[in-house]
From Swiss-Prot:
It is a multi-pass membrane protein. It comes from Xanthomonas axonopodis pv. citri (strain 306). One of its GO terms (cellular component) is plasma membrane. The chain crosses the membrane at residues 62-82, 96-116, 127-147, 163-183, 202-222, 238-257, 264-286, 299-319, 339-359. Keywords: Cell inner membrane, Cell membrane, Membrane, NAD, Quinone, Translocase, Transmembrane, Transmembrane helix, Ubiquinone. One of its GO terms (molecular function) is quinone binding. GO terms for biological process: aerobic respiration. NDH-1 is composed of 14 different subunits. Subunits NuoA, H, J, K, L, M, N constitute the membrane sector of the complex. This is NADH-quinone oxidoreductase subunit H.
Length: 363
């Protein structure tokens, strides 16, 4: 299946390159659109899936109208885009407009180094992991700017909560990725996946030797995206919508889009760092060449990556429907007193496992 997709892309790439410098620019723009458009469409269907799944958990139907609920998210998008963006009279006008853009831009830029397969990646950067850490850290600036520019105590309180929470859990996430870097010997995302390849299937994935780091990264990813049960930033019972309380229309839609794009991104990164990315869980167990349409089941391919991502994206919804919101002090305690010490200890354990050959870096 991967070969079939690449056979469609390569001739198109060569045709654009044949147009000269202008063709190279157009090809770059096309690659950006090939990332942005699917992300936007995926967010729309993800919202529908969230409503449906929570509806089933509540023993109700969920969205049933507008194409059996499938197109309800698109209807919501059009509704928000055609609504007026009301700016408070006391707000800082320029900063108020820049804030949602500053939140959305890093959420989309991070996708440029995410590999969907061995050859399906926009930019196979050698420092992809460091680039991701930088991009995912920039989003908090838009949130802080929104809270300050709104000139509202509720928005500012939500922004301050977000800043403290994101900074706290970024440290734990960064330490967890140090363990991944030690185990793989690389900061290139494709090389991290290749380091988990082998003839033992899922036993070669980093999920098993780095299981504590996997849990830390997963939970920290939920906290990083301000989702339940770590959604004190938008605590409805306390500060309404937090930093977004003064936003409406298209500006609110940009914040909404950035949040869900980050949720999907975290699901991708967990799958790449700990579950072998596009690798098959039975890789090495079956050696057969039958058809490109089914060989990916044991050879690996982007469908495996999408299935793993679907699981973690659905887990976000499960967390929201199942767990009560943490208090702010409990969130800080979990990040600083539990996750950071745990990751530091397991970094040392990972180094020892690599030194004594317990972790093998691919085949």
């Amino acid at each position: 299946m991967n070969e079939l997709l690449l056979n469609l892309v390569d001739p198109l790439h060569q045709w654009f390159l044949g147009l000269g410098d202008g063709g190279a620019v157009l090809w770059s723009v096309l690659k950006i659109l090939l990332i942005a458009v699917p992300v936007i469409v995926t967010v729309a269907f993800y919202v529908v899936w969230e409503r449906k799944l929570i509806g089933w958990m509540h023993v109700r139907h969920g969205p049933m109208y507008v194409g059996m609920g499938i197109f309800q998210a698109f209807a919501d998008v059009f509704k928000l885009l055609f609504k007026e963006i009301v700016q408070p009279a006391s707000s800082h006008k320029a900063m108020f407009v820049i804030a949602p853009l500053l939140t959305l831009a890093p959420a989309f830029a991070a996708w440029s180094v995410v590999p969907f397969d061995a050859k399906l990646v926009l930019s196979n950067a050698n420092v992809g992991l460091l680039y991701l850490l930088a991009m995912t850290s920039l989003g908090v600036y838009g949130i802080i700017l929104a809270g300050w520019a709104s000139n509202s105590k509720y928005a500012f309180l939500g922004a301050m909560r977000s800043a403290a929470q994101v900074v706290s859990y970024e440290i734990a996430m960064g330490f967890a990725l140090v363990g991944v870097m030690i185990a793989s010997g690389s900061v290139n995302l494709s090389q991290i996946v290749f380091a988990q390849a082998g003839n033992s299937g899922f036993f070669d994935w980093f999920l098993i030797p780095l299981f504590p780091l996997f849990i830390v990264y997963w939970v920290s990813g939920v906290a990083e995206t301000n989702r339940a049960p770590f959604d004190v930033v938008e605590g409805e019972s306390e500060i309404v919508a937090g930093h977004m309380v003064e936003y409406s229309g298209g500006a609110f839609a940009l914040f909404f889009l950035a949040e869900y794009a980050n949720m999907i991104l975290v699901s991708f990164l967990i799958s790449i760092f700990f579950l072998g990315g596009w690798l098959s869980p039975i890789q090495g167990w079956v050696n057969a060449d039958i058809s490109p349409w089914i060989d990916w089941l044991w050879k690996g391919g982007w469908p495996w990556l999408l299935m793993k991502v679907f699981f973690f994206a659905s887990a976000y919804i499960w967390f929201r429907a199942s767990f009560p919101r943490y208090r702010y002090d409990q969130i800080m305690r979990l990040g600083w007193k539990v996750f950071i010490p745990l990751t530091i200890v397991w970094i040392a354990v990972t180094a020892l496992m690599v030194f004594y050959g317990v972790i093998q870096k691919g085949v």
